[in-house]
Amino acid sequence: MKTTRAIAMLGLLLGLAACGTTPSTIVERPTTARPQAPAAVPATNGAIYQAATYRPLFEDRRARHVGDVLTIVINERTRAGKEASSSASKTSAVDASVGGVAKLPLKMFQGLGINAEASAEYEDESALDSSNTFSGNVTVTVIEVLPNGNLVVAGEKQIGLDKGTEYIRLSGVVQPDTIQAGNTVSSAKVADARIEYRSSAKFDKAEVMNWLGRFFLSFIPL
């Protein structure tokens, strides 16, 4: 009975150790527009121009309403560098002597001198350079129109490969004036942008600590 219980416990621990989770997403809002209730059709007054169905005649069809789509051209390059140096030095000296004192018990110590010197130096230099590049396209959906006319957009692209699935997610706020021809906008023009690339491949899962390891490190930090 005890042997069976020990084997079961060992199997449970091995299963927990093998469990790994993919990194959490930074895109918290929905990545697509929710179905909208049909808008009430306003009564027509017989005029050719109707504000509810207005579309500019001499410009491309661009995203304006909830549910419209536009393409974000991702072209992100970041680079950061840091250099630091420090140095310190310290020197100390001691010089002492015993003169001729007639009442000194031991005559052998008369004229004794002590001379000591000590020095210490410290110097440290460090340099850090990091660069990242992220390019691609992802089509997003307008999920909300703010009172000032700006568009809250979000979208996700999934690419299934032999060894896993790649996820590209994006969310942010787009100003309609920055939308270019072809209904595209540069990622540099997206406010509050959250752009991420994730993968469910085994290589990426190996970088995520399993559940059991995170449990023990929660109260036994390295």
UniProtKB/Swiss-Prot annotation:
Is this entry keyworded Signal? Answer: yes
Q: Where is the lipid attached (S-diacylglycerol cysteine)?
A: 19
Keyword list, A-Z: Bacterial flagellum, Cell outer membrane, Lipoprotein, Membrane, Palmitate, Signal
Q: Which residues cross the membrane?
A: none
- Where does this polypeptide localize? Cell outer membrane; Bacterial flagellum basal body
* Keyword Cell wall biogenesis/degradation set for record: no
Give the signal peptide as a residue range, or say none if absent. Answer: 1-18
**Main location group:** membrane
Coiled coil (UniProt feature)? none
Q: Which domain of life is it from?
A: Bacteria
Check the record and name the Pfam families matching this protein.
FlgH
* Molecular function per GO: cytoskeletal motor activity
Biological-process GO terms, alphabetical:
bacterial-type flagellum-dependent cell motility
What are its GO cellular component terms?
bacterial-type flagellum basal body, distal rod, L ring; cell outer membrane
- The lipid modification N-palmitoyl cysteine is placed on 19
What topology does the record note for this protein and the membrane?
A: Lipid-anchor
Q: Which family does it belong to?
A: Belongs to the FlgH family.
Quote the function comment for this protein.
Assembles around the rod to form the L-ring and probably protects the motor/basal body from shearing forces during rotation.
Oligomer and partners: The basal body constitutes a major portion of the flagellar organelle and consists of four rings (L,P,S, and M) mounted on a central rod.
Quote the PANTHER family the UniProt record gives: FLAGELLAR L-RING PROTEIN
Protein name, UniProt field: Flagellar L-ring protein
Can you name the source organism?
Answer: Thiobacillus denitrificans (strain ATCC 25259 / T1)
